[in-house]
Amino acid sequence: MGSDADDKIREIVELAKLYDIYGDMLSDHNRVVFEDYVLNNYSLGEIAGEVDISRQGVRDIVVRCSGKLRRYEEKLGFLKKINETEAALNEMEDMINAGNTDPEIILYCVRKARETLVK
């Protein structure tokens, strides 16, 4: 039971991150509808009344925008790079917090973080 809710939360977080990166590539109208549904948690009915379209029209826009954002990520991969860089930096932070301040290991982590940005 909790798994479906967890999956929905993960999907919303992913869409919010994709929107932060690629949202400006959506039309103004689509951006308003997507923001209201995904980021502001408005219902389809609330948005439909606000922008004067049907609830099905709102749903179609949200689905279409979600697909566009995912396709942008497939082609450009900015979120993947951000996540990989964050993981490399977290690894470096964990090593330092564990008392491992060997310059060679820290340099390795810095290079690893840099690689995630340039590949």
Can you say where each PLM-predicted feature lies in the sequence?
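Alpha-helical residues within the helix-turn-helix
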Residues: 24, 49
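Helix-turn-helix DNA-binding motif, specifically the short coil turn and the N-cap/start of the second
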Residues: 54-55
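Intrinsically disordered, low-complexity basic tails/linkers immediately adjacent to helix-turn-helix/homeobox/MYB/SANT
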Residues: 76-101
